[in-house]
């Protein structure tokens, strides 16, 4: 008879310890970039969807921006289309863009919307094309010191946040696919990390949370003792040139968000069930927190 009592007491302590964070975040917007392994494991997908519903029912306003790299790569392979990456970004030809557009909104976004809506009529899927949410501008990247064209890859030039604010006010959870036109109507694929940062800034979010496939930010990867729990934007800017190429878009996104007025950005391990709740509602958190200098 003692074990259930201990279990109940432990659960009560966990819930009670979350109270300060629930109060701090009540009524605030939290932008979550959903990607990596959390998008490919069925248990993690279900846990993430439940986390978003939990936030919503606690009076917090989650906005999900999702990637789809593994799914796009799988579809390109299935169709016999060559794929390439430069500087951490997918090289996007018109043919690749058609596949990305189909997979992001038609497959990945739909699946997440359905997982969330298994808990109630909450999620609404949108793309950067809807209500002119994003206006893109062509992006080049620097690879080994050389400016490199990566095709129809865009950065976010402008965010028209009104449509998402309307959804939030209606109690919905926006699920955003990052395809968007430029000023001339040419559609681009926007890196989901980049889009999440721009959206967090435009929405006046309290936090930007980035799911990854590592425990957080390592200052000297692969030395696992170099994991940092908190870092400011000044130190992070100095560290940026030394990072692995796959981490660069995520760290650039954190810097953009925090420099744009978002109080904190968080790089967390999406391979852990309920990682978003652990990061937001515990003192210890998980991963790396980025704050202003």
Swiss-Prot record:
GO molecular function: acetylglutamate kinase activity; ATP binding
Subcellular location: Cytoplasm
GO CC terms, sorted: cytoplasm
Annotated metabolic or biological route of this protein: Amino-acid biosynthesis; L-arginine biosynthesis; N(2)-acetyl-L-ornithine from L-glutamate: step 2/4
EC number(s) from the headed UniProt entry: 2.7.2.8
Residues noted as binding substrate in the record, renumbered to the chain: 68-69, 90, 189
One GO biological process term: arginine biosynthetic process via ornithine
Enzyme class, broadest EC rank: transferase
Known catalytic reactions: N-acetyl-L-glutamate + ATP = N-acetyl-L-glutamyl 5-phosphate + ADP
Pfam families named in the record: AA_kinase
HAMAP family: ArgB
The protein's name in its UniProt record: Acetylglutamate kinase
């Amino acid at each position: 008879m003692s074990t259930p009592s201990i279990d109940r007491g432990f659960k009560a302590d966990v819930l009670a310890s979350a109270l300060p964070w629930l109060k701090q975040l009540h009524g605030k917007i939290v932008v979550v970039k959903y990607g990596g392994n959390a998008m490919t494991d069925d248990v993690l997908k279900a846990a993430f969807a439940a986390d978003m519903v939990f936030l919503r029912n606690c009076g917090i306003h989650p906005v999900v921006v999702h990637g789809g790299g593994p799914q796009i790569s799988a579809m390109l392979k299935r169709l016999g289309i060559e794929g390439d990456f430069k500087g951490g970004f997918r090289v996007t030809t018109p043919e690749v863009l058609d596949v990305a557009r189909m997979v992001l909104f038609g497959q990945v976004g739909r699946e997440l919307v359905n997982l969330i809506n298994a808990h109630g009529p909450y999620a609404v899927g949108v793309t950067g094309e809807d209500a002119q949410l994003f206006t893109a501008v062509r992006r080049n990247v620097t690879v080994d010191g050389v400016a490199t064209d990566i095709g129809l890859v865009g950065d976010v030039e402008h965010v028209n946040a009104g449509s998402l604010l309307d959804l939030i006010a209606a109690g919905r959870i926006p699920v955003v696919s990052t395809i968007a036109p430029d000023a001339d109507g040419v559609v681009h694929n926007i890196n989901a990390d980049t889009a999440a940062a721009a959206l967090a800034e435009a929405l006046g979010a309290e936090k930007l949370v980035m799911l990854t496939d590592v425990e957080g930010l390592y200052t000297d990867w692969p030395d696992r003792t170099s994991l940092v729990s908190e870092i400011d934007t000044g130190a992070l800017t100095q560290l940026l040139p030394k990072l692995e190429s796959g981490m660069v878009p995520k760290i650039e996104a954190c810097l953009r968000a925090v420099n744009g007025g978002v109080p904190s950005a968080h790089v967390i391990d999406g391979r852990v069930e309920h990682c978003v709740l652990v990061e937001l509602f515990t003192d210890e958190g998980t991963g790396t927190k980025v704050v202003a200098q």
